[in-house]
Amino acid sequence: MTATSPLRVVREEQLARLGGDTFDMLIVGGGVTGAYAALDASLRGYRVALVEKSDFASGTSSKSSKMVHGGLRYIEQGNLSLVRHSLLERQRLRRNARHLVQRLPFLFPVMERDGVFDKRLAKAFESLLWTYDLAGGWREGILHQKLTKAEVLSHCPTFNEAYLTGGFMYFDARVDDARLTLTLARTAAFHGAALANHARVAEVTRNAQGRVDGAIVHADGREIRVRAGVVIMATGVWLRDWDGRRKGDAPALQVRPAKGVHVAIPWLKIRNDCTVTIPVPGRNRRATITRWGNVSYLGTTDEDYDGNLDNVYCTRQELDFLLEGARSALKTDLQPHDVVGSIAGCRPLVGPPGGKTIEMRRNHEIHIAPDGLVTIVGGKLTTSRHMAEQTIDAAQTVIGKRAPCRTKSAYLLGAAGYDPQAIVASGGLAAHLGERYGTEARFVSDLIDARPSLLAPIVEGLPYSEAEVVYAARHELARSVDDVLSRRTRARLMARDASARAAPRVGQILKAELGLSDALVASQVRDYVAAVQYEKSVLIGDNG
């Protein structure tokens, strides 16, 4: 599937469709699961609407570890079936979103002591890696490797040599989670779905017989009545606060938010060329350090969270936890002031309180209420396609229709005909745009050809250009400064302070492209800068 012109989703047209059309399926929640469900249903030929109260991927789906993997620890938990299935889904994503999903080497150092595991357990760990390869890791085209001490240091020169004896490397994949989610939503629109971000569902409606028949949506100061044969709640951890059921009805599923944080550090302080797994001293835990552009991001944590789901931040305590592990494993004295960005989000685990969240299985659950409301929650980024398939299968039973799933081999926008090896090898602007837009990169290049001044960088020290902001406004449903700097680009994670300085210019471009008022632009810039400052104050620990 290759578009000959850039997809343009006009907001006014989408809102008019929400109020004027009757849909087979209304999906609430614009994270990766909801976006994949919208694509799945659209490809089956259904009339689909997807609404999101904030921005696409503004919740958990932009704050993951950005890994598309089977998960070695799921083998350790005995969940081999999840690993097999995840590795199969990984390869489907590697094909269908080949411009976004890249191979990611994982390095496990072997230590005499004080490591993720010691030398005595190395043989057992290698058996685990063989199990991983046989479960589906081989589909990546390369099996795990045993490394010498020198080879480990060649991949991460700053690793602490004390007690290091060697290591193992195996191969998975990574993705810009926010761009994947956005691309899924845009591909759904390409196939006919109606999309609206910044559109909040205020109420799930029911007919005289008590059956779900749509929702009331608030967007741009108006109230829109959306009619649909079935409503799917795909709101992730937000199901904890509101799940669309009527007052008095028992909750369908028990959601347990588990908070995870990552912090970004200048890559030159680490100099890793792969994901390095490190121990956290005295915690029986491990963390990872992954290179992404000019930063390496360090994570993650896994703890219960009962706070405000719309305002989740990395705290000083969590930062110290991660830096303690990094300082122990590396010959680099990382300090809080070295951190250039952070993300914090919550995983939507399914289950009751009790026990450690890190030990809970990452399975998903789908529920069909007696009134026809369908709910999906749980799972993980890697298995989102399969979760969506099962969700639409369930929704079909509500509306009494049946059509086969087509997403197993469906290319996302930008993937068909894209040659990642050739584009990345070319380097420079072509490689940067290729890894973000795939074959759609030519549309961004067209903007630059028409107006060369758009090649100007938008954020100091990062490769994003003004052309990408224009493209985000015209073709990627960006409505705010935060949409652009946090998700259409990843400037807030990679260069928090520089992104705040770029906010006024982003606001001016959005004003010109979207016709925003001076007052609204000023408000967006002010809110973004304030949010960045608050994030920083919580991280450093001086927020009172």
Model-assigned labels for residue ranges:
Residues 21-23, 221-230:
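Core beta-strand elements of the Rossmann-like FAD/NAD(P) dinucleotide-binding domain
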Residues 29-31, 53:
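Glycine-rich Rossmann-fold phosphate-binding loop(s) that bind the pyrophosphate
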Residues 233-248:
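Flavin (primarily FAD) binding-site architecture
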Residues 1-25, 40-44:
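Extreme N-terminal leader/targeting segments of oxidoreductases
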Residues 66-155, 287, 439:
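Dinucleotide-binding Rossmann-like beta1-alpha1 core, especially the glycine-rich loop
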Residues 42-64:
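Glycine-rich FAD pyrophosphate-binding loop
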Residues 17, 22, 54, 113-124, ...:
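C-terminal accessory subdomains/tails of enzymes that are appended
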Residues 197-213:
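A conserved short coil-to-beta-strand element within the FAD-binding core of flavoproteins
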